[in-house]
C-alpha cells in the first residue's frame, strides 16, 4: 500500500509498527472508553495484538494531520470501518474526512455497504456517522449502504 492523500491536511499512511507513537493514544482513558468501552489503558501487548489483527484483516492506516500522526483508521475485510483520533485532535473534522475516504475505498473494493460499531454513550461519533449518511440499525450498529 502507498500513502493516500485525503486533502491538504490529511494523508493516510499505511500501517507499520510504531508503538512509541500509537500507544499514547490508547493510554487516554476517554479514548479507551470510546473505542472498547474499557476503563483501563492499553498495554503494549494489547496494542500490538490489535494492530496485528487490523493489519491482516483489512486496510489499516495511520492518520497524518498536518505532518503529525494523530490516529488510525481501518477498513476491515468484513466491511467494518474502525477509526481512532487522539483527543488533542478531535473536533477538527478529521474523522469525517477519513470516513468519507473510507467509503470511497469501500466502493473501489466492490463492497455494497460498510458498518461502524459505536457505543450508545459515544454521541460525538454517532452524530458524525449519521451526518455522513450512515443509518442506525441496532443499538451499536450503523450501516452505510453503497449500492
Q: Would you name each region that the model predicts?
A:
Residues 15, 85, 118:
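Hydrophobic adenine-recognition pocket in adenosine-nucleotide-binding enzymes
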Residues 37-88:
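Acetyl-CoA-dependent GNAT
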Residues 91-106, 123-131:
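Conserved acetyl-CoA-binding loop-helix of GNAT-fold acetyltransferases
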Residues 117, 130-147:
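Conserved catalytic-core motifs of GNAT/GCN5-like acyltransferases
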Residues 106-118:
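Conserved GNAT acetyl-CoA-binding A-motif
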Residues 1-52:
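A short, well-structured alpha-helix characteristic of acyl/acetyltransferase catalytic modules
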Residues 7-8, 64-66, 145-147:
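Active-site beta-strand termini and strand-to-loop segments that position acidic
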Amino acid at each position: 500500500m502507498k500513502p493516500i492523500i485525503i486533502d491538504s491536511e490529511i494523508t493516510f499512511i499505511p500501517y507499520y509498527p510504531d508503538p512509541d507513537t500509537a500507544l499514547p493514544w490508547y493510554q487516554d482513558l476517554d479514548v479507551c472508553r470510546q473505542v472498547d468501552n474499557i476503563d483501563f489503558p492499553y498495554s503494549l501487548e494489547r496494542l500490538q495484538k490489535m494492530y496485528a489483527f487490523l493489519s491482516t484483516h483489512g486496510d489499516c492506516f495511520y492518520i497524518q494531520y498536518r505532518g503529525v500522526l494523530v490516529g488510525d483508521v481501518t477498513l476491515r475485510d468484513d466491511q467494518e470501518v474502525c477509526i481512532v483520533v487522539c483527543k488533542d485532535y478531535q473536533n477538527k473534522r478529521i474523522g469525517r474526512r477519513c470516513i468519507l475516504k473510507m467509503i470511497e475505498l469501500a466502493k473501489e473494493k466492490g463492497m455494497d455497504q460498510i458498518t461502524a460499531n459505536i457505543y450508545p454513550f459515544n454521541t460525538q461519533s454517532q452524530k458524525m456517522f449519521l451526518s455522513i449518511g450512515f443509518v442506525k440499525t441496532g443499538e451499536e450498529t450503523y450501516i452505510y449502504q453503497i449500492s
